[in-house]
């Protein structure tokens, strides 16, 4: 998904996905969580990394579960669980937020890019996607994320917006990309190993 989004934005970076068990900062701020995980991931891999932290914030619950949404996805029924949580509430409005943190390597200050999509929750519909995609309808759409194909979803998703911001920043600060390329030339290894995308 990330490779496709960034390639469509004109920055087809080679990415390698790693599942890592990182200590996670407990905070209501997705930006702070992403930055903290990014520092740990950079130390663990010894190279440049991207880390994504996703939140789903429900208006009726004062913004909860927010970054704690992952704990509602453990049983594969997160969409239905969220809908039942809103029983009795008039508002079904929500927003999805992705915080993508990027670091050039250990010791570097992570850059955090945020994307947000407003929408509302409905009864589960669709089979694509994962987590709560089947219950979230983005503003201006009539279908859930799970009813969209990946190309359509990637044009409007919260993650796409965060990655678009990051891509724009990297184009405007090309010295970061030059440094990564020079590091690669100085340390011969497969280019695919130079970037890591960590998602939890």
Regions found by a protein language model. Name each.
Residues 1-199:
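Anionic-ligand binding patches
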